Amino acid sequence: MAAEGPLTGRLALVSGASRGLGRATAVELAAAGAYVVCTARSTRTGATQTDVDDLTLEGTLDAVRAAGGDGEWHRCDHTEPDQVEALLRGVLDRHGRVDVLVNNAWGGHDHHEEADGEEVWDEPMEQFRAMLLGGAYSDYVTTLLTLRLAMGPARSGLVLTTTWHTPEPPAWVPYESSKAAKNRLVYALGYHLQDKGIGVVAVAPGWMRTELMEAHVAPEVLAGKTESPHLAGRVMAALAADPEVMRWTGQVVDVGELADHYEIDDLDGTRPHGNAGRYRPSPVPPPLPGEGG
């Protein structure tokens, strides 16, 4: 039997769920009782990352069930509207609802390395295009179709987006700029949906010990500077269960701040604040015309 919890009876769709933060979020939502639809491009017959074994959708569903939850998986490229629409129509035919959408699909690093000292004008132009498509554009496609087919008619739902603070001072140009596009999308959607009963919140974790990070970065470099992706996953489960989640709508909120608010700890019992001092508070969308003071 699936886990019972604050999200029992609700359906969550998590994109980019084959590894890292997406997998951890799927597991934590399932542990809180949600039925989780896991999507990504990587399956056991074709994975985008092979440096670590079983970073696949099947592996994620195994982890969901090991946590006492249940769900299903579907291969989907979230930059392709036809694929996303077919996915959503299938989910709605089978389950009749989508209560929580987690926009976590990325892929911006699939073929690009982080800047390493070259001049700004020497960074490959293709990086920015890939990051915009894999980030803000895939978020836009998936969110609009979910609103159109599910949350809009229901006048309820929660859209969560995983992101990165735009730090001060700015760092890697294509990465920072593409994340800023994601964040502004959340702000704009939050503004326009605030009277529809649909929340839109971006969560910004610190430096995470994902499977690929642990495979490629020395343990002594990660020690004391990182958090597990389950901290952000637990925070998103708490947001999904919060009847007052609209207080955060349209904002980019730090995972450490949310962990303090909901009194949530990481897997090891710590509560990291990896972003402290490196970002500005997110702006709050203004009231719609004729509303508020």
Spans of model-derived segments:
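Active-site loop of short-chain dehydrogenase/reductase
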Residues: 10, 69-70, 97-98, 150-163, ...
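Catalytic loop of short-chain dehydrogenase/reductase
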Residues: 107-111, 119-131, 139-140, 148, ...
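Conserved Rossmann-fold SDR core element
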Residues: 29, 97, 183, 193-208, ...
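Hydrophobic structural elements of the Rossmann-like NAD(P)H-binding subdomain
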Residues: 102, 160, 200-203, 213
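C-terminal helical subdomain
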Residues: 202, 219-293
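A glycine/serine/threonine-rich, flexible loop-to-helix segment
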Residues: 48-53, 116, 195, 205-227, ...
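Short-chain dehydrogenase/reductase
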Residues: 1-95, 107-119, 126, 290
